[in-house]
């Protein structure tokens, strides 16, 4: 039988353990940036893009919740990678008011750019607090564009023979995959930027597109046990957690765990930026 002293000792250890885990989850892991390195397969990739690097950054959530010095460190890390291309897949800000536009302008001055090109899309938080404020989205998009980054809102551009398309945000009800991919033809090398991976499940709207997609939005669930799926995911399709997923119709998606947060807690889901090396599929 456990005596009082042993019981109190065990209880004290338990409390200390819980406090340590809480401190780790709140103060350490949300800012413990991971640089993930992967290969990105593109069918019929133009020769000029073989071996080029692409930095994927998502879910910055610039605003009152994410520490400014942490974001500065993210920018510095991204610039040191010297990517050829950079893709930002939305949720630039956590909107609370016009102060976020000034913060965004400051951070855009330091955000990494690709030596060849830099592209971006919008996420739901870029549409304001209720994801329906069109003027907020226009202001965010304008600031990004004025900084020299090519904003893609249901449109595409040609990159040396490869189509790069960007789909607008799903929750704001402005996602139009068919419009974004209007210039795509079967067999054309392409890459799609799309904030919310749930958008992938409207297959008919994608017009037969069978290439690679970069997404964010989920933050990887932010908390998960080593062997179980995250208990909370902001998507309908719970397959869409993080990392590379085979959609099943030729499309593959990489879902970033994101940089920022709306709730300062992460467990077993470190924030990330991802450095891809392009190669032929």
Where do the protein language model's features map onto the residues?
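C-terminal segment of N-terminal export signals and the immediately downstream linker at the start
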Residues: 1, 18-55, 68-69, 73-76
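N-terminal secretory signal peptides and thylakoid transit peptides that target proteins
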Residues: 1-18
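Extended active-site neighborhood of metal-dependent phosphoesterases/phosphodiesterases
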Residues: 36-39, 103-184
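Beta-strand-turn-beta hairpins that frame and shape the catalytic cleft
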Residues: 42-54, 149, 156-165, 185-186, ...
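Active-site-proximal beta-strand elements of phosphoester/diester hydrolases
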Residues: 51-61, 161-170, 191-195, 252-258
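Membrane-embedded segments
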Residues: 52-139
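Active-site neighborhood of phospho(di)ester-bond hydrolases with catalytic His/Asp-centered motifs
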Residues: 57-58, 86-90, 118-124, 152-153, ...
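Conserved beta-sheet core of the metallophosphoesterase superfamily
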Residues: 197-274
